[in-house]
């Protein structure tokens, strides 16, 4: 079962994000708090949204076991003059993989993108994550090999912001 995450899901989402960081060998970068996640998902200014996957037959609002999630937000294509959907994180517990949860999460996101008039649906994947790359290709997604990803964080971000 796939559904929109609600405020009560924040603790499990935070725990799953921690597991994702471990899987991606990025534990040292997981510094976000449960409180900040909840504020950004459900506060006055919502920066992102999330879907959760619950195990089959479970009542997700009472005792269902959340086995995966997708966290996403809108971006914008100036070339298309249309919004886009960006998948920040997709994670399914290792023991629950190959049961269709990832595909159902992505299908739900594709439907959201179409319903909202998005011109594209994008995400990134670590180069070493071959199982995910094969999965995405099987869905019909294509890698954007001609594009690179850049990021400013910490001191570099502050330094650029402080330039006179």
Residue ranges and their predicted role:
Residues 1-15, 26:
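A short beta-loop-alpha structural element at the N-terminal edge
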Residues 14-39:
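Conserved GNAT-fold acetyl-CoA-binding loop/helix
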Residues 39-52, 56, 86:
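A short helix-loop-beta-strand connector motif used in the catalytic cores of GNAT acetyltransferases and
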Residues 48-70, 93:
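Conserved beta-hairpin
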Residues 72-79:
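A conserved beta-strand-loop-helix scaffold within acyl/acetyltransferase catalytic domains
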Residues 96, 100-108:
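Conserved acetyl-CoA pyrophosphate-binding loop and the N-cap/start of the following alpha-helix
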Residues 114-124:
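Conserved GNAT acetyl-CoA-binding A-motif
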Residues 123-132, 144, 151-155:
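Conserved beta-strand-loop-alpha-helix junction that forms the acyl-donor binding cleft
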């Amino acid at each position: 079962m796939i559904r929109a995450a609600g405020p009560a899901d924040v603790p499990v989402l935070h725990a799953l994000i921690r597991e994702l960081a471990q899987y991606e060998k990025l534990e040292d970068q997981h510094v976000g708090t449960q409180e900040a996640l909840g504020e950004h998902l459900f506060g006055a200014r919502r920066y992102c949204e999330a879907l959760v996957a619950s195990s089959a037959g479970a009542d997700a609002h009472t005792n269902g076991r959340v086995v995966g999630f997708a966290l996403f937000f809108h971006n914008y294509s100036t070339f298309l003059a249309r919004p886009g959907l960006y998948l920040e994180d997709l994670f399914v517990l290792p023991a629950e993989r190959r049961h269709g949860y990832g595909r159902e999460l992505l299908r739900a996101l594709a439907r959201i993108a179409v319903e909202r008039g998005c011109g594209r649906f994008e995400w990134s994947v670590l180069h070493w994550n071959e199982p995910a790359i094969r999965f995405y290709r099987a869905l019909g997604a294509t890698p954007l090999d001609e594009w690179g990803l850049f990021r400013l964080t910490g001191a570099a971000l502050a330094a650029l912001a402080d330039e006179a």
